[in-house]
Regions:
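Short, charged, surface-exposed loops that flank catalytic or proteolytic processing sites
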Residues: 121-130, 198-209
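Short pre-catalytic strand/loop immediately N-terminal to key active-site residues, enriched for Gly-Thr
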Residues: 170-183
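Charged C-terminal helix
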Residues: 204-247
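Conserved N-terminal subdomain of the carbohydrate kinase-like
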Residues: 1-87, 235-243
Length: 247
C-alpha cells in the first residue's frame, strides 16, 4: 500500500497555464509524526519534486521520523534540466537538496542536477569517463547508489549510468531513443524502479525494467495526438509490467 505525504496540491501539471497551487509545507512534519504515532512502518520512502528549501529541510526531518534501518530511501532530486534550475529556485537550492541526497540509498539525478550537486560545469557532450567522474564525486555526498538518467549511448540510444561506491562498480544500460518529450517521464521511471525494488529485484534489474517500461509508455503515448499536453499514458502499458518483472 502507498502512503502519500503531499507537499502541494496542483490543479494540473506545470505545462498547463495559470495553474492553482496549494502549498502544504506546514503539514509535512505533522503528518509524518502522526504516522509515527500510529506505528506506520514503511518499506520505502520515495521523494520527488520539492518546491522550496523549507520543504527539503522538512522532508529530511520526516525521513528521520519515518525511516527505519531497513527502509529504502529513494531520492529523485528534481530541480533542474537542460543546464538550468527550474523556475523559482535560486542558486543556493542545490545546497539544500544535497542534504537530502546524503540520506539516500538511491539517488536519480539527470546530468544538470548531478552537475549542480557536485559543482561541475554543465556540458551536454561529456564522455563516459567524465560522467563516471561526476558520479564518483556525487557519491561523496553519501548515497549508497547513484543513478544518472538520460545518458546518451549514441544517437539512437538513451539510458542510465549507475555507480555503487562501496564496490567501485558501474552499470550501463540503454534502450531505443525516441524523439519525443512528455511531462512525467522522470516520475514514471523512478516509480517503476521503486516498484521493482519492492518486488525484490536487484538495483540493476530494477533499472532495466524502469528504462524499458518508460520506453513502452512513450511508444504508447506517441500514438495519441493529444498526449503531449496530458503526459505519459502509462495506464495503457501497465499490462506489460508482469512480463517485465518475470524476465
Amino acid at each position: 500500500e502507498c502512503a502519500i505525504l503531499p507537499t502541494a496540491v496542483l490543479s494540473a501539471h506545470t505545462m498547463f497555464p495559470d495553474i492553482l497551487c496549494r502549498d502544504l509545507t506546514a503539514d509535512i512534519l505533522p503528518i509524518a509524526r502522526y504516522w509515527r504515532s500510529q506505528q506506520v512502518q514503511l518499506d520505502a520512502v520515495y521523494t520527488g519534486y520539492l518546491a522550496s528549501p523549507r520543504q527539503v529541510e522538512d522532508v529530511c526531518q520526516a525521513l528521520e521520523v519515518l525511516a527505519g534501518p531497513d527502509t529504502l530511501r529513494f531520492v529523485d532530486p528534481a530541480m533542474a534540466d537542460g543546464g538550468a534550475l527550474y523556475t523559482g529556485f535560486d542558486e543556493d537550492f542545490p545546497r539544500h537538496m544535497a542534504r537530502l541526497v546524503a540520506q539516500a540509498d538511491v539517488v536519480t539525478p539527470n546530468l544538470t542536477e548531478a552537475c549542480l550537486l557536485t559543482g561541475t560545469p554543465y556540458r551536454e557532450d561529456y564522455d563516459l569517463p567524465r560522467l563516471r567522474d561526476i558520479l564518483r564525486k556525487l557519491a561523496e555526498l553519501g548515497p549508497r547508489h547513484v543513478v544518472l538518467t538520460g545518458v546518451p549511448y549514441g544517437p539512437d540510444k538513451l539510458g542510465v549510468l549507475a555507480y555503487t561506491p562501496a564496490e567501485d562498480r558501474f552499470f550501463e544500460y540503454g534502450s531505443r531513443r525516441i524523439d519525443a518529450h512528455f511531462p512525467g517521464t522522470g516520475d514514471l521511471f523512478s516509480s517503476a524502479c521503486v516498484g521493482a525494488l519492492m518486488r525484490g529485484k536487484p538495483l540493476e534489474e530494477a533499472l532495466r525494467l524502469a528504462v524499458d517500461f518508460t520506453l513502452l509508455c512513450i511508444q504508447v503515448t506517441c500514438r495519441d495526438e493529444n498526449a503531449p499536453w496530458y503526459g505519459v499514458e502509462f495506464e495503457k502499458a501497465l499490462r506489460y509490467l508482469p512480463e517485465l518483472l518475470e524476465r
